Amino acid sequence: MAPATPKTSKTAHFENGSTSSQKKMKQSSLLSFFSKQVPSGTPSKKVQKPTPATLENTATDKITKNPQGGKTGKLFVDVDEDNDLTIAEETVSTVRSDIMHSQEPQSDTMLNSNTTEPKSTTTDEDLSSSQSRRNHKRRVNYAESDDDDSDTTFTAKRKKGKVVDSESDEDEYLPDKNDGDEDDDIADDKEDIKGELAEDSGDDDDLISLAETTSKKKFSYNTSHSSSPFTRNISRDNSKKKSRPNQAPSRSYNPSHSQPSATSKSSKFNKQNEERYQWLVDERDAQRRPKSDPEYDPRTLYIPSSAWNKFTPFEKQYWEIKSKMWDCIVFFKKGKFFELYEKDALLANALFDLKIAGGGRANMQLAGIPEMSFEYWAAQFIQMGYKVAKVDQRESMLAKEMREGSKGIVKRELQCILTSGTLTDGDMLHSDLATFCLAIREEPGNFYNETQLDSSTIVQKLNTKIFGAAFIDTATGELQMLEFEDDSECTKLDTLMSQVRPMEVVMERNNLSTLANKIVKFNSAPNAIFNEVKAGEEFYDCDKTYAEIISSEYFSTEEDWPEVLKSYYDTGKKVGFSAFGGLLYYLKWLKLDKNLISMKNIKEYDFVKSQHSMVLDGITLQNLEIFSNSFDGSDKGTLFKLFNRAITPMGKRMMKKWLMHPLLRKNDIESRLDSVDSLLQDITLREQLEITFSKLPDLERMLARIHSRTIKVKDFEKVITAFETIIELQDSLKNNDLKGDVSKYISSFPEGLVEAVKSWTNAFERQKAINENIIVPQRGFDIEFDKSMDRIQELEDELMEILMTYRKQFKCSNIQYKDSGKEIYTIEIPISATKNVPSNWVQMAANKTYKRYYSDEVRALARSMAEAKEIHKTLEEDLKNRLCQKFDAHYNTIWMPTIQAISNIDCLLAITRTSEYLGAPSCRPTIVDEVDSKTNTQLNGFLKFKSLRHPCFNLGATTAKDFIPNDIELGKEQPRLGLLTGANAAGKSTILRMACIAVIMAQMGCYVPCESAVLTPIDRIMTRLGANDNIMQGKSTFFVELAETKKILDMATNRSLLVVDELGRGGSSSDGFAIAESVLHHVATHIQSLGFFATHYGTLASSFKHHPQVRPLKMSILVDEATRNVTFLYKMLEGQSEGSFGMHVASMCGISKEIIDNAQIAADNLEHTSRLVKERDLAANNLNGEVVSVPGGLQSDFVRIAYGDGLKNTKLGSGEGVLNYDWNIKRNVLKSLFSIIDDLQS
């Protein structure tokens, strides 16, 4: 929802919430004030409405004496808010005349103006009925208002003097007729920034503002009844178009011109707009290419020189920026508002119903929002997939006048560009998980042209690709890069993209191959942004990247480069280094490069880590739904959702890394399991850690903002407090007998942590940082800062002395200073004491109780005070930057190592809570790593789970009744492969996924939801599940099946776990059966992995009934043949299923009986005919008439062993393509083959 802003109301709030007669009387008295008689000869002046700033309440303090006799710095006392204040000018004859001579008929709702009364009065009764006004700060904005505002708004228009009864449900922003005039940009800027000198703009609801001059232009605001987004149902039903889910209520931002007719005004504007911006009709890029051109660059816009010559300074300032980021939504700062022009304004209107201003600005269509709502509206555009550019004022109006006087326009420049993949502001980040922006580059396998390679290797490289990638989480500043060689199917790229799932991708135009491009887009996050940039000029090559790093001076010297950057450049990894260059260009364009690259948080990414962790490739991550489900792409029901119980944001991001790379080494797994056991038993330690971690903010992201100097002061204080909490934890754990990884992580805290944290304990006034969001250093810390503070105190003392003098002079102790908008330190004097006011004092405001003045000396001191505070504000910002720089000096040596340790401990707590949450039964897995004593090679793997449940079903269940458990045993005493058959929907796929999930949990160091678990460490899980085609990647169902199967055959080892579901069903029955039989034999005999093959080919089991490493399994069911009802028991038993029972499932789905009966007859005939043909062929091939079937796999193996390369994994060997084919595996091959022969003979 949009940030709600209190709306300025032209009427008082009444307790009953309705427009009572008292309210009308009050409004009448307000209007009659403007029509009172003025002595003749008084020069007439225009009636000015207050700026937004003058409509706010300013809390003030009473003047008190210092107990030590000195003067206190508090110069203000509270105002009596029962006084009703009204708006006026020094003279009002023009208004009186306009009202009396108006040619337009008056509305029935208009109030009569009493032109004979010299002064307007308001009764106490009126005031008593408007108590809800008290102590409310008033801010005018385009967009929001309170629900309790009156339904009717009365607006006095200039010249005509007509009071308009507004029935609009929108807020409107109405500048003066000259505001935004193309010939008066300077004044336009000045008026937008009025009120900057004071944070609040007045302490009364309706203030008598007597202007000194008539030349200044003011904005008039027309606010009408409109609910705040926080308090109104966004999807309310009205006559307008239906709101979108995130759509804010209708708003308008309408510059007003004092034309006689709104229709003629709008028509005139539209005509001028069309004439001046005719070149926007046929959009072209900066090189004048039309949209139809393949090389069209949507980021730029061509503006003809004739248009440039007609632009005002303000227009030039805007279009200079907008033309270079035509694909961005540009928020342009104007005073206390951000404005959208032309295409951006129209888009805002179409998407979010932000109203288009009727009169525009400088002939540009516009919509506007208050500056305080920028983050909300920027986030709305970003969620819709747009980029947002923020153009801010680099100086205040006062600073501009101090710099060059009244000439010129306020400096503005592009502050930042916000995109969904590169957000750094904590308020705009809605997830604790990392969001990545990735740059990718592709080159052919022979890119490096290595002449020393033999011809066969060169031919192989022609079928490979080289990829370079670099990706960054801009919120933390962590940048990772890599270069890798991939196969023709881009297997590794698929894995990388599945792990990273970037929100934004930068790629060189026409660089990626068709397949790589499809993989990148298919595996990126939903609504990801894809940026195609120019080769060389924007996506830097290796040499250009090096030159940019040197010229931009991210690092002091070349020796100061991060190790991975230095290594890539020195070793000639040009593709990876160029990928970093592509990312560097994009960060420069976003104006993030200085802050992020200089952090030196650059590492090499290893997406496999095969030596230290289990490998989960991209297909497996998708098939097992590790991070996102296949239903809606969220994490509901995923394994990550089960494990994501970390307390700190850093811990949640670390947990994702842990889950991508489960442990592989037995000692590492056991150590983590010991830690989990320790935390499960030591409740006190757990509570201590959890309480401490719950107090920690997102330190990793805050450190990045400290480095970029964008952190808020109060957040900087939070960082120091958080590290103080950490050293308290460290101190309290000194005497604890910590076990496992907890002890390892606690001891990894840097030695200088305590000293570094204590040096910041008293660096500045902490409480002021929390309460006032300012840094006040200890006296003597900064000389310039001390001088500035002394100057402000000196001015306050002088003002205090003058005030005390005035009190004595007027013999009135109630004289005080008041701030009202940009007029600060105005002298407020009770009416009873104003008769002695000197004639040279200038009256600034008045009500029935007080009048406010400026004397010459106070006006001068007030101006000096404003300038002093402006200078002090700059010093405060500079001081914060220097403090951030000092803190950031220990980023890599102290702060980040500490955060890493905390994140790891938090992950241990998360695994502990997951283990506790599994319910009963659950157990600690037993890890067994068997090695051949003679050859020191790993023996074949095995696993055994008793009464295993799927952990993502019925989370937190306390009994096993909620899910039907199953025993799973592969390897060791049982065959390594299970050939699983059964009816459709009987639970085969669930069994397959459940086995894989259990293995991952065990190697994560977590308890497993079963009665007992014993397994060897599994090096890789590979899956072939489902029968979906892949339109995004241009692959058919059968192609997807075979491509995934090839990866299994290439990468699997005797310690891998394979899951293959219904291989071959994408092709014809004969082709599919042949492929399934061949693959199963090769895996069972030569690769010797653990795994399951689920199939509906009933005869496949008979082909392997003699194979010692294939075990037939089935899912049990109960069948009622009469009604064709099937009861699924979800229990896995040994044996072969009687069939797939497809007709029964069809009946359960409601297909008509006639169709099912016909299908059953056809199926019976087909099965009978197929069996007769097979038996006849077998009999014809047997001389003795006996039907003996020799498996095709056995025949092939003997041919290769006898006539090929024998027991080798060469092209003609029996184990062709097998990754690991050592002597133990070869011995098992021979055992299997001879076992099959023995069974055939028997």
From Swiss-Prot:
Polar residues bias (residue ranges): 1-11, 54-69, 103-121, 220-233, 245-270
Low complexity: which segments have biased composition? Answer: 18-37
Q: Outcome of G368A?
A: Moderately reduced activity in a mismatch repair assay
Q: What is the effect of changing E339A?
A: Defective in repairing 8-oxo-G-A mismatches
**Where in the cell does this protein reside?**
Nucleus
Give the Gene Ontology MF terms in alphabetical order: ATP binding; ATP hydrolysis activity; ATP-dependent DNA damage sensor activity; four-way junction DNA binding; mismatched DNA binding; nucleic acid binding
- Indicate where this protein is primarily found: nucleus
The record's Pfam families line, in alphabetical order, gives:
MutS_I (PF01624), MutS_II (PF05188), MutS_III (PF05192), MutS_IV (PF05190), MutS_V (PF00488)
Q: Which InterPro entries match?
A: DNA_mismatch_repair_MutS-lik_N, DNA_mismatch_repair_MutS/MSH, DNA_mismatch_repair_MutS_C, DNA_mismatch_repair_MutS_clamp, DNA_mismatch_repair_MutS_core, DNA_mismatch_repair_MutS_N, DNA_mismatch_repair_MutS_sf, DNA_mmatch_repair_MutS_con_dom
Keyword terms:
ATP-binding, DNA damage, DNA repair, DNA-binding, Nucleotide-binding, Nucleus, Phosphoprotein
Q: Does the entry feature the keyword Electron transport, yes or no?
A: no
Q: Where is this region: Mispair-binding domain?
A: 305-421
What GO CC terms are in its UniProt record?
cytoplasm; MutSalpha complex; nucleus
Show where the record puts the motif PIP box: 27-34
What Gene Ontology biological process does one annotation of this record name? mismatch repair
Phosphoserine: residues carrying this PTM = S102, S145, S150, S201
Q: What is the effect of changing F337A?
A: Shows defects in both homoduplex and mispair DNA binding and is only partially functional in a mismatch repair assay
Regulation of protein activity: Inhibited by Cd(2+).
Give the result of R852A, as annotated.
Moderately reduced activity in a mismatch repair assay
State how changing F337K affects the protein, per the record: Completely abolishes mismatch repair
NCBIfam families assigned: PRK05399.1
Q: What does this protein do?
A: Component of the post-replicative DNA mismatch repair system (MMR). Heterodimerizes with MSH2 to form MutS alpha, which binds to DNA mismatches thereby initiating DNA repair. MSH6 provides substrate-binding and substrate specificity to the complex. When bound, MutS alpha bends the DNA helix and shields approximately 20 base pairs. Acts mainly to repair base-base and single insertion-deletion mismatches that occur during replication, but can also repair longer insertion-deletion loops (IDLs), although with decreasing efficiency as the size of the extrahelical loop increases.
Q: What else is noted?
A: Present with 5330 molecules/cell in log phase SD medium.
Domain notes per entry:
The PIP box serves as a PCNA(POL30)-recognition and -binding motif.
Similarity remark: Belongs to the DNA mismatch repair MutS family.
The name of this protein is DNA mismatch repair protein MSH6
Organism in which the protein naturally occurs: Saccharomyces cerevisiae (strain ATCC 204508 / S288c)
Q: What is the lineage of its organism?
A: Eukaryota, Fungi, Dikarya, Ascomycota, Saccharomycotina
Q: Which gene encodes it?
A: MSH6
